Regions:
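Conserved lysine of the Walker
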Residues: 33-34
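N-terminal pre-Walker A segment at the start of P-loop NTPase domains
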Residues: 1-14
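Hydrophobic anchor at the beta1->P-loop junction of P-loop NTPases
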Residues: 25
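Short glycine-rich substrate-engagement loop in P-loop NTPases that contacts/grips substrate
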Residues: 44-73
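Conserved catalytic/switch belt of AAA+ P-loop NTPases
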Residues: 86-110, 118-119
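Structural recognition of the conserved hydrophobic beta-strand(s) that form the central parallel beta-sheet
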Residues: 75-76, 101-107, 129, 138
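Interdomain motor-coupling "hinge/lid" segment immediately C-terminal to the ATP-binding subdomain
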Residues: 114-169
Length: 169
């Protein structure tokens, strides 16, 4: 397995965990949600584990709190396969002391108030939106040009790149 490359989202996730009970990390498939969350999680539940998936789904229906037990922050990966996690985590956050209890990751987010999720999560959940790695995160750019600087003062931007156009594409 390759070495973890730090992401901009690492700091954002850390800040959210220090401020709220649960954090939902969302974004497209394969953008690094699980890997990023694993860096800060103290325990992990992989809902898509083929050897345990059926057992986990039965536990969701009979004793979901057992699945929530573990060192915090506890990562629930692919949580959307069992939307019941949302209300169970909201309830747990309300009745435990402390921020940074849960990290939820998944590519799809169920609709609130669809019969499976009863509460919006306001005040209990924070969100981190992830995107695929930027060129700077992947090491393909030195960060000499930033989009925010480009919009703030386009006349003062000046940098060169060793990458060819085909390498950037």
């Amino acid at each position: 397995m390759s070495e973890y490359k730090p992401r901009i989202a690492d700091g954002i996730l850390r800040e959210k965990l220090e401020a709220i009970g649960a954090v939902l990390v969302e974004g497209p498939k394969a953008c690094g949600k699980t890997t990023t969350a694993e860096q800060q999680a103290k325990s992990v539940l992989y809902m898509n584990d083929p050897m345990r998936r059926m057992q986990y789904m039965q536990m969701v229906e009979t004793d979901i709190n057992t699945l929530l037990d573990g060192a915090v922050p506890r990562l629930i990966d692919e949580w959307q396969t069992a939307p019941q996690f949302w209300d169970a985590i909201r309830f747990t956050v309300d009745h435990r002391d402390g921020d940074g209890q849960f990290i939820l990751t998944g590519s799809a987010v169920p609709v609130i108030n669809n019969g499976q999720i009863e509460h919006t999560g306001t005040g209990r959940f924070g969100w981190v939106k992830m995107r695929p790695m930027s060129l700077w995160e992947s090491g393909e750019s030195n960060g000499g040009v930033s989009l925010s600087e480009l919009f703030e003062s386009p006349e003062s931007i000046g940098a060169t790149s060793t990458l060819s156009l085909s390498q950037l594409a």
